[in-house]
Amino acid sequence: QRAVILKMEMMPFLDSVGLVLDDNKYYLFSRRANDKIVVYHQEQVNGPLVDESGRVIFADFNPSKRPWSVASDDSNNSWNPAYNCFDRPGKKCISFTLHINGKDHDLLAVDKIHVDLNWRYLNEYLDQISANDEVLFLKQGHEIIAKNQLARE
């Protein structure tokens, strides 16, 4: 857990990181508005998602039903279409899901890792590339994931 928190502290563009373990339990590391990173986890598969104090945050959480998991079920790494964040009402999430295979899977005991990017940081990064041209961030299917200010106007 500490390693994920340290990485997130160094990468402010990450809103959350989720880990689906090889026993199908789930850990979610989520950045709050005050930049504090909170950890949620499941003690049983598809059971309640609880915070560090044991308080139930989501009573019946099934990671395999989340948009980032459904979009990547074909065992490929993938960008996922924007979807409603379950732990940040009114906010859209954009995730990249990474399937862990081979020696890394054996070492980490993790099946999937998903990272939610912060829209503001992504858009600011695209703005830095060029303020005079439209800059689009596309996924392989040519779907627009994000765009700079000029392209948003």
Residue spans for each PLM region:
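A short acidic (Asp/Glu
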Residues: 29-30, 90, 149
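Extracytoplasmic/periplasmic ligand-binding sensor regions of membrane-associated signaling proteins
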Residues: 43-120
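Beta-sheet entry/capping signal
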Residues: 16, 77, 94, 134-135
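Hydrophobic beta-strand positions in blades of beta-propellers and related beta-sheet-rich domains
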Residues: 26, 95-97, 144
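Extracytoplasmic/periplasmic sensory segments of membrane signal-transduction proteins
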Residues: 1-76, 126
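Hydrophobic beta-strand positions
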Residues: 19-21, 49, 99-100, 137-139
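Solvent-exposed, extracytoplasmic
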Residues: 2-9, 13, 104, 110-153
